[in-house]
């Protein structure tokens, strides 16, 4: 796949969606719980997703029971992370039964695999949204459409890899930062879904 830069207009559109989500719940504090498995790129992506969530009015929490939004960001290269993700998704079902307004999403390279997307779509009906790494920058739009339509938004990787700069980031550490030095690769390793 090719990498393309996200335009300033596309970034501005995501900021518009951030404001629209913020306006949906102006009087209530909302919390986001992020669960990350796998590589350092996933850590960097999770920081970006949490930054966007904060811009939409969410506060990062370490307690999934407190969350209004749960995001799981697993790695597809490591099978253990995939299996752990599906197991944890099953545990989150019980939280959603207690809190039907809870929104649960899975993102990352695991979702980029068609068989995993189909598996989640069919076996995990309480998962509200899925999107692959190419659509990380569209998280505000995907969340807004999930919240306002009441329908599941299930995307794999749409189009080309997107390089999006200028979106908010939440750093989990005060003394280190995950920095992406490349997006994708062209080695076409048989075990990897990235290219």
Positions of predicted regions on the chain:
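Proteins enriched for Cys/Gly/acidic motifs involved in redox and nucleic-acid/cofactor modification
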Residues: 1-195
């Amino acid at each position: 796949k090719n990498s393309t830069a996200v335009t300033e207009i596309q970034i501005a559109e995501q900021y518009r969606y951030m404001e629209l989500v913020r306006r949906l719940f102006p009087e209530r504090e909302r919390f986001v719980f992020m669960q990350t498995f796998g590589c350092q790129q996933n850590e960097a992506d999770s920081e970006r997703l949490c930054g966007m969530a904060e811009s939409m009015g969410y506060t990062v929490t370490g307690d999934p029971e407190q969350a209004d939004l749960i995001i799981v960001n697993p790695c597809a290269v490591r099978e253990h992370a995939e299996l752990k993700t599906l197991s944890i998704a099953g545990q989150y079902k019980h939280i959603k039964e207690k809190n039907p307004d809870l929104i649960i999403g899975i993102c990352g390279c695991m979702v980029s695999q068609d068989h995993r997307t189909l598996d989640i779509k069919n076996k995990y009906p309480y998962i509200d949204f899925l999107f692959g790494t190419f659509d990380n920058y569209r998280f505000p739009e995907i969340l807004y459409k999930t919240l306002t339509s009441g329908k599941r938004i299930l995307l794999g990787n749409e189009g080309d890899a997107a390089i999006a700069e200028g979106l908010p980031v939440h750093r989990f550490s005060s003394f280190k930062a995950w920095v992406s030095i490349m997006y994708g690769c062209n080695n076409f390793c048989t075990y990897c879904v990235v290219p």
